[in-house]
Amino acid sequence: RLDMVGMFAGTSPKIDERFEESKVYNDQHGFTTLQAPVEDYRVYVCTDTHVTKTQTRWTYFIDTYRQDSLCPVAVHLGDIIDAQNYFDEMYSAYQAVPLNPAKKDTLMAVAGNHDIYFKQWPEYIKYFKTCYYYFIVETPSGKKDLFVVYDSADGTVGSKQLQWLRETLEWADKQNFRHIVACTHTHFFKRDGSQGHTSNYTQEETYALLNLFEKHGVDMVWSGHDHSREITQVKEMTCIVVDSMKDEDKKPFYMLVTMGEKIDYDFVSVADIQ
């Protein structure tokens, strides 16, 4: 049954509540450092798969990054499912894709509005444990890249998470990271109102986050939500809205990123995967 209230007001815990629940897990388990197999490694990035009863492109994406020997990690930028009761289908499809015995890889998830609305937050945290975290990827020579994942699923980061972002980036200033990438669902900029009431942050919050990221040398911000690609340069920082990849899309893409001395990226069509 469609929860119409949730489409407008949301029925999930608000961001500060989600932060506190996630903090319990983070405090107990800490954050992850992954080992890259090469200096110039690959990250596969997708968003807005909106999994329902079909998971064709979702499973294709999983199989593709698992078979790439240069990829230690993939990132899903949110709206992994479309509506209520599809987390089981999503996870069953994920588990059904064979592992590659020759490599280790990890899927990192970002919470999207479709993932948490309609009372779905308990399901999201059941599978993904936390809505905010960072992870580090270390190359064979010891160079380290920082990926900061934060929750913007209902169009705001909240006061507690904003403070965590400040503290994390202040800590990062002292760590000599090669690159810093922020990963979230809601985008800073848009050319249309296609996503309605969940479109993006307030202007004040946009300015605060952009200033924070610029101050601490964030190289890129990856987001989804709008279902169409947009690339905006803000001084030295590149903000990318990645295309959606749901099965019904006519122009679906994922982003293939090479993390080296500079960050290169391209977009790969999966329109033929049906």
What are these regions (language model features)?
Residues 43, 74, 147, 180-181:
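Hydrophobic beta-strand anchors of alpha/beta hydrolase catalytic cores
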Residues 81, 172-196:
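Short acidic, glycine-rich surface-loop motifs adjacent to enzyme active sites
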Residues 8-30, 85-178, 199-200, 205-214, ...:
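Extended active-site neighborhood of metal-dependent phosphoesterases/phosphodiesterases
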Residues 212-225:
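Functionally important transmembrane alpha-helices
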Residues 267-274:
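Short, solvent-exposed aromatic-acidic interface loops
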Residues 48, 78-79, 112-113, 185, ...:
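Active-site glycine-centered loops adjacent to acidic/histidine catalytic or metal-binding residues
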Residues 2-4:
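Beta-strand-rich modules
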